[in-house]
């Protein structure tokens, strides 16, 4: 029998205010790195939350909007 792999993963967002407060969110596996501005109840302010651990993210090729001949 074949095991089914999940398309989503749960990541931990850690407050950049160094309060130790963290949040967990669910994202698709191929999504870019997540940074969010959320409320931190320890410091009682909105602060930036970044991913706690590094994960493999597929590099996206930048879009080329120039009309140059290929």
Curated annotation (Swiss-Prot):
Any one GO MF annotation of this record: structural constituent of ribosome
Complex formation = Component of the mitochondrial large ribosomal subunit (mt-LSU). Mature yeast 74S mitochondrial ribosomes consist of a small (37S) and a large (54S) subunit. The 37S small subunit contains a 15S ribosomal RNA (15S mt-rRNA) and 34 different proteins. The 54S large subunit contains a 21S rRNA (21S mt-rRNA) and 46 different proteins. bL33m stabilizes the tRNA acceptor stem in the E-site.
PANTHER family linked to this entry = 39S RIBOSOMAL PROTEIN L33, MITOCHONDRIAL (PTHR47037), LARGE RIBOSOMAL SUBUNIT PROTEIN BL33M (PTHR47037:SF1)
Protein family (similarity comment): Belongs to the bacterial ribosomal protein bL33 family.
What is the organism field in this record? Answer: Saccharomyces cerevisiae (strain ATCC 204508 / S288c)
Identify the InterPro entries for this entry.
Mitoribosomal_protein_bL33, Ribosomal_bL33, Ribosomal_bL33_sf, Ribosomal_zn-bd
Miscellaneous comment in the UniProt entry for this protein: Present with 2500 molecules/cell in log phase SD medium.
Stated role: Component of the mitochondrial ribosome (mitoribosome), a dedicated translation machinery responsible for the synthesis of mitochondrial genome-encoded proteins, including at least some of the essential transmembrane subunits of the mitochondrial respiratory chain. The mitoribosomes are attached to the mitochondrial inner membrane and translation products are cotranslationally integrated into the membrane.
UniProt GO BP: mitochondrial translation
What Gene Ontology cellular component terms go with this record?
Answer: mitochondrial inner membrane; mitochondrial large ribosomal subunit; mitochondrion
Q: Which UniProt keywords apply?
A: Mitochondrion, Ribonucleoprotein, Ribosomal protein
What protein is this chain from? Large ribosomal subunit protein bL33m
Entry annotated with the keyword Ribosomal protein: yes
**Source domain of life:** Eukaryota
Q: Where in or outside the cell is it found?
A: Mitochondrion
Its principal location? mitochondrion
